[in-house]
Regions:
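Conserved sequence signature across two-component system core domains
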Residues: 20-21, 46, 64
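Receiver (REC) domain active-site loop signature in two-component systems and cognate sites
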Residues: 70
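Acidic catalytic/metal-coordinating carboxylates
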Residues: 48-51, 74-77
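Alpha4 helix (beta4-alpha4-beta5 surface) of REC/receiver domains from two-component response regulators
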Residues: 77, 97-115, 119-126
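The C-terminal output helix
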Residues: 129-144
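Conserved acidic segment of CheY-like receiver
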Residues: 13-26, 30, 34
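Active-site beta3 strand of CheY-like receiver
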Residues: 59-65
Length: 164
């Protein structure tokens, strides 16, 4: 929750979505599907895991849609970092793989949903709505009061250093 806004005002604001997928076409398709919605706004895009972490820290979205197979850092690694650095964020993993990866990822990392891309946009929209409506006031309050972790995972630091 924005620090200076009353809880009621925050709850009425459009929820902010960050889309992280290495496919430009997938990102554009999702943006086009959500374009007419007033309850959700796409606040940013990322084409790899490292970019998703940086943008999420800066933009503080309510929900992040992650592709599992991304360059730099895959969706599972990215989700793990995000859960530590962006408190209260909801995460949906959107993948070409079967949903069989879902049970491990949802329990071990805390991902809210794992969807197969072949299931299509209707399933994705349903998962987005579920993730956003199940975000209770308590979670919003925790998000407002918790501070993101100051440290980054060593693997992220190594990848950043190797890019320089």
């Amino acid at each position: 929750m924005e620090a200076n806004l009353p809880a009621v005002t925050y709850l009425l604001m459009p929820k902010r979505l960050l889309i992280a997928d290495d496919s430009y076409l997938v990102r554009e398709t999702i943006k086009n599907v959500l374009a007419g919605r007033t309850d959700i706004t796409v606040c940013g895009e990322a084409s790899n895991g490292l970019e998703a972490v940086e943008k999420a820290k800066a933009l503080k979205p309510d929900l992040i849609l992650l592709d599992l197979a991304m360059p730099e850092m895959n969706g599972a690694e990215t989700a793990s970092v995000l859960k530590m650095t962006v408190p209260g964020v909801r995460i949906i993993l959107f993948t070409m793989y079967s949903e069989n990866v879902g049970s491990y990822l949802t329990s071990a990392i805390g991902i809210d949903a794992v969807l197969s891309k072949p299931d299509g946009m209707t399933a994705l929209l349903s998962a987005i709505e579920t993730a956003l409506t199940s975000t209770s006031t308590l979670i919003d309050e925790q998000k407002a009061t918790q501070k993101p972790a100051e440290t980054t995972l060593p693997s992220v630091e190594r990848r950043k250093a190797s890019q320089v």
